[in-house]
């Protein structure tokens, strides 16, 4: 499965557009992780605990996006975008793209 942020692929032809696919991953926040992140913000520097959560969430959301596209018979997803959102109780990562059948 080919995933790309572009909407045109050099050297590949789109045989059929199969529709928009979306995926979402939600993680609950963690009191200890939040406390450690707050300390890090006061001291300064990167908050590795949250970076790891976002890294994992992005991997998971792309895996889910790929699975949903495969169910449509796609072998590629064009125009992939990933968005993150954080509230006091959760972290939301969404992905969207256009499922396609490539030649």
Swiss-Prot record:
InterPro entries: UPF0145_dom_sf, UPF0145_YbjQ-like. Gene3D superfamilies: Hypothetical protein apc22750. Chain B (3.30.110.70). Pfam families: YbjQ_1. Belongs to the UPF0145 family. PANTHER family: UPF0145 PROTEIN YBJQ. This is UPF0145 protein CYB_1351. It comes from Synechococcus sp. (strain JA-2-3B'a(2-13)). The lineage of its organism: Bacteria, Bacillati, Cyanobacteriota, Cyanophyceae, Synechococcales.
